[in-house]
Amino acid sequence: MMLELLSDREIRDITAWLRSLPAVSNPGLKKTWLSDDIKKQLRDGSYPYDDDQPTPGVDPPDVPPADPVALGKHLAYTSCTECHGRDLNGWGPDDPTPSLIVAKAYTPTHFSRLMKTGIAANGRETKTGFMSGVARWRFSVLTDAEIDALKRYLDSR
């Protein structure tokens, strides 16, 4: 679900960035395990997706939304659903991720610190440390405006 919601501009920006990287040689890299039949089905839209998988064809916006709450929603559904579930209410039986309603317990300052450094509202790493690592690795590159937009959306739910 995350990638299918990226805007056309975001896809173009990512593609341009990937093309700007120097080529690498990796003769040990295995070719894709996808058969020619599966590749054809993916291209023509006939691949039988599992019931619990997102359905292709969601129309993403042409550009990321300008309104802060709408931008926050866009960021949440393109960045947070991987771990917190498609509805952002958490998931996972063994080591469940929390519902993002927990964001309401954070002040804007504490939320920004979590996103940039991985330090939770209590001044320590998150309970399992997983979100702390993800924040430092993935979310620390968000701008202050993006973090504010994400917080606004999560608070509005």
State what each model feature region is:
Residues 21, 126, 142, 146, ...:
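Ligand-binding pocket scaffold of soluble enzyme catalytic domains
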Residues 14, 72, 78-87, 111, ...:
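The canonical Cys-X-X-Cys-His
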Residues 118-133:
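Accessory, usually C-terminal, subdomains that scaffold auxiliary metal cofactors
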Residues 8, 12-15, 19, 108-112, ...:
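An amphipathic alpha-helix signature
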Residues 26-36:
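Extended, well-folded interaction surfaces typified by the phenylalanyl-tRNA synthetase beta subunit core
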Residues 1-7, 34-43, 85-113, 130-143:
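Gly/Gly-Pro-rich "capping" loops immediately C-terminal to redox-active cysteine motifs
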Residues 40-76:
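Electrostatic cytochrome c docking/interface patches
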Residues 19-22, 84, 116-119:
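Protein kinase-like catalytic domain
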